[in-house]
Regions:
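C-terminal amphipathic helix plus adjacent low-complexity
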Residues: 1-42, 174-228
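Conserved catalytic-core segment of nucleotide-activated headgroup transferases in glycan assembly
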Residues: 11-106
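Structured mid-domain segments that build the active-site/substrate or prosthetic-cofactor binding neighborhood
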Residues: 77, 116, 123
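Nucleotide-activated donor-binding/catalytic signature segment of Leloir-type glycosyltransferases, i.e.
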Residues: 102-119
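Short acidic-hydrophobic, aromatic-tinged amphipathic segments that line or gate anion-handling sites
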Residues: 116-119, 168-180
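A donor-sugar binding/catalytic signature common to diverse glycosyltransferases
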Residues: 120-168
Length: 228
């Protein structure tokens, strides 16, 4: 029953509906735009799923990088001498955040020109359809979502919600991380959907939202939809 419920809930999320992540007010899986986003070429395409710089970078524990900013700088530097197409996208909720992540990223892209900016409102469904080959995150929920479409995800921290499962890659150090990115197309990963559903259930359905607050919904609404 748990697997069936998780499958249903995950598929609802991937249809662009909000639900199990109550702190979000916008979905990353909205309508597909007719205008193409990814370049039409034969290069492998990598998506950098950016984190808000202030959004609890140490909440789960230490990662390969000290924070989300250092992670971004490393990835941008890696893109400078690369045979891949690189893209970066923020969550659509970023425009409602109170930090300057979007501003800082756009300023950095003036220097790192191999990375292309994708508007946050662009649907992940569109990127998947157009042919993203790899997604990068530190510990984000894209690690559950993209593998469902057989797209590999490489995390930049072993302290992530998917660590006990094999549908993500979990490098242990910087050298391994760099090597996995540069050679991701050689990696052979057999994704089992039931593992994805189990992980989704344990992360988003097993624990009640009101375990800390008497009403989590009221807290989120009080803060205008933001929790960080």
């Amino acid at each position: 029953k748990s697997i069936i419920l998780a499958k249903k809930k995950l598929e609802i999320r991937l249809q662009g509906k909000l639900g199990d992540m109550l702190y979000l007010t916008k979905s990353s899986y909205g309508k597909i735009n007719k205008k193409r986003v990814l370049s039409r070429n034969k290069k492998k395409k990598i998506l950098i799923a950016a984190h808000s710089f202030c959004d609890a970078p140490h909440a789960r524990g230490k990662g390969i990088f000290n924070d989300f900013y250092e992670w971004i700088i490393f990835i941008f530097e890696l893109s400078e001498d690369s045979k891949f197409d690189w893209y970066i996208k923020c969550h659509p909720n970023f425009y409602e955040y109170f930090d300057d992540t979007v501003i800082i990223l756009k300023e950095l892209l003036k220097k790192y020109k191999n990375v292309k900016w994708i508007e946050p409102q662009t649907s992940n469904s569109q990127l998947i359809k157009e042919g993203i080959d790899l997604a990068l995150t530190v510990d984000g929920s894209i690690g559950i979502e993209y593998p469902y479409f057989n797209i590999p995800v490489i995390n930049a921290s072993e302290n992530n919600a998917h660590i006990n499962y094999k549908f993500n890659y979990h490098p242990r150090n910087l050298n391994e991380y760099k090597n996995k990115i540069n050679n991701f197309y050689k990696l052979k990963q057999k994704i089992k959907n039931n593992e994805i559903f189990e992980c989704y259930f344990m992360n988003f359905l097993y624990f009640k939202n009101n375990w800390f607050f008497s009403s989590f919904d009221k807290v989120i609404n009080y803060h205008g939809g933001n929790f960080t």
